[in-house]
Amino acid sequence: MGRAFEYRRAAKEKRWDKMSKVFPKLAKAITLAAKDGGSEPDTNAKLRTAILNAKAQNMPKDNIDAAIKRASSKEGNLSEITYEGKANFGVLIIMECMTDNPTRTIANLKSYFNKTQGASIVPNGSLEFMFNRKSVFECSKSEVKNLKLSLEDLEFALIDYGLEELEEVGDRIIIRGDYNSFKLLNEGFESLKLPILKAGLQRIATTPIELNDEQMELTEKLLDRIEDDDDVVALYTNIE
């Protein structure tokens, strides 16, 4: 998604009740990470990242601990599933989900698309080749300055760890690398002792499209329904 679209989405997110919307999604990511790689963050990079992202959203420690414990219970029976869909105006949508009931999840997603004229779920794999998967990290400019590093120094230091692109956005620095370089880039930040504000794997459209305000308003109705679903943990489109 392009910056203009992300700005509009960010404005909406500020209005969301984080306790009811964001925290359950973060908790699922923590539970699944602990289930896959163990409950010790020191030896589970995926869990470290999930906890880091939760702390960035001010998720209480008790909630984080509960999510880790849930991995060893029946409640921790989560699976990762990706679904794909199309909407009007050439919009492509990829939805990453974490669910304990795939039947419920796909039924809900189909209902959102069925309520939107011209939109439909498509077979998995239909759209994946139209998105590049990237490792994306965010850090604070002030933390970089505290380490007495220039942006050029930071870029040079992380190139050997898989950095492909460095971008300044406000008071933050965005680092992007290949999908397979996530673990290596994480090690690069750790070697510099540079705190990470947010990290994850994202899908970036190879051929973004632009929508006018009217088209965006109609499309956002569908995207809002999808994002409001507790099973959907990440949503990507080809909108510029």
Swiss-Prot record:
Keywords: Cytoplasm, DNA-binding, Transcription, Transcription regulation. GO terms for biological process: regulation of DNA-templated transcription. It is found in: Cytoplasm. The keyword Protein biosynthesis does not apply. Pfam families: TACO1_YebC_N (PF20772), Transcrip_reg (PF01709). GO terms for cellular component: cytosol. Its main location: cytoplasm. The keyword Mitochondrion does not apply. It comes from the Bacteria. GO terms for molecular function: DNA binding. NCBIfam families: PRK12378.1, YebC/PmpR family DNA-binding transcriptional regulator. Belongs to the TACO1 family. HAMAP family: Transcrip_reg_TACO1. This is Probable transcriptional regulatory protein HPP12_0160. It comes from Helicobacter pylori (strain P12).
